[in-house]
């Protein structure tokens, strides 16, 4: 069972702890170039532990929206190397090393192969030459303490699992980009997340019917990447409408475009859906800056 609750009442900051229950807070629910929402980065909180999944170009602003900052968040998990998901990590690295005066580095949960890719192809250019560490350029480990998920198997898929306090985080690869990829093996690194084997968040992905259908068997609530147009590297609303009723009925849609609330702009007369996800059998559009609380 879950409830949707208001956060930051009377200007209060979002607490990074709970009384033991699982909480998911989307700092944003928008697509990469959104102007009406923040980007789809989200906090997972349980007990005394938390993790921010992705920190895009608008991530530091989105944290400020809820009274937080990149120095207050102490654990991060990047899913893939697109700017709306990792564009804020340079600020995370630099603020925590040079501005906040914290004695501790923030933590990063990251799979081994992706760690090298994230650093060499995205983050190193902005931060590795800030100083000489024993005569060598800085490395990711100079900015973050690395927490390593372990490879295992779930539902016949290779996944990576990390126990973060009382929350279990299971990462699975997704079929996101390039758009020519027809299998996970041909795709660049991108991951979705299963939390406590209860809450599944697709991560960025093209439409991959088996992916949500398979995880719906063990998930209470699901959040699926959704765009309002066809093509590209995200699942479209039209494609998601082909999922079984029992999958849609437990799925919220997120990572959507700025015209989500104007279905006349993207629903065709020939479509057999309304563009209102509740009427169309989903749980609805996911909302930013509210708490999805799980008992």
Where are each of the predicted segments found?
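Core dinuclear metal-dependent hydrolase active-site scaffold
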Residues: 2-68, 145-210, 287-295
């Amino acid at each position: 069972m879950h409830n949707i609750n208001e956060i930051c009442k009377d200007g209060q900051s979002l607490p990074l702890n709970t009384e033991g229950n699982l909480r998911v807070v989307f700092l944003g629910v928008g697509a990469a170039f959104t102007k009406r929402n923040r980007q789809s980065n989200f906090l997972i909180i349980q007990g005394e532990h938390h993790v921010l999944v992705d920190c895009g170009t608008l991530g530091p602003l989105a944290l400020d929206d809820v009274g937080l900052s990149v120095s207050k968040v102490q654990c991060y998990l990047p899913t893939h190397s697109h700017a709306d998901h990792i564009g804020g990590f340079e600020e995370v690295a630099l603020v925590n090393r040079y501005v906040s005066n914290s004695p501790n580095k923030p933590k990063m949960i990251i799979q081994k192969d992706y760690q090298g890719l994230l650093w060499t192809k995205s983050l190193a250019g902005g931060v590795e030459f800030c100083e000489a560490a024993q005569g060598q350029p800085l490395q990711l480990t100079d900015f973050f303490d690395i927490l390593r998920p372990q490879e295992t198997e779930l539902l016949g898929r290779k996944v990576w699992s990390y126990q973060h306090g009382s929350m279990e985080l299971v990462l699975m690869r997704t079929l996101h980009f390039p758009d020519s990829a027809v299998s996970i093996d041909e795709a660049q690194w991108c991951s979705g997340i299963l939390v406590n084997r209860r809450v599944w968040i697709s991560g960025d992905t093209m439409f991959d019917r088996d992916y949500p259908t398979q995880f719906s068997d063990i998930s209470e609530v699901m959040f699926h990447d959704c765009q309002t147009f066809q093509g590209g590297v995200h699942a479209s609303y039209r494609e998601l409408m082909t999922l079984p009723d029992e999958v849609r009925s437990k799925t919220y849609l997120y990572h959507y475009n700025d015209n989500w609330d104007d279905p006349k702009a993207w629903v065709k007369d020939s479509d057999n859906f309304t563009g209102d996800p509740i009427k169309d059998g989903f749980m609805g559009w996911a909302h930013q800056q509210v708490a999805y609380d799980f008992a």
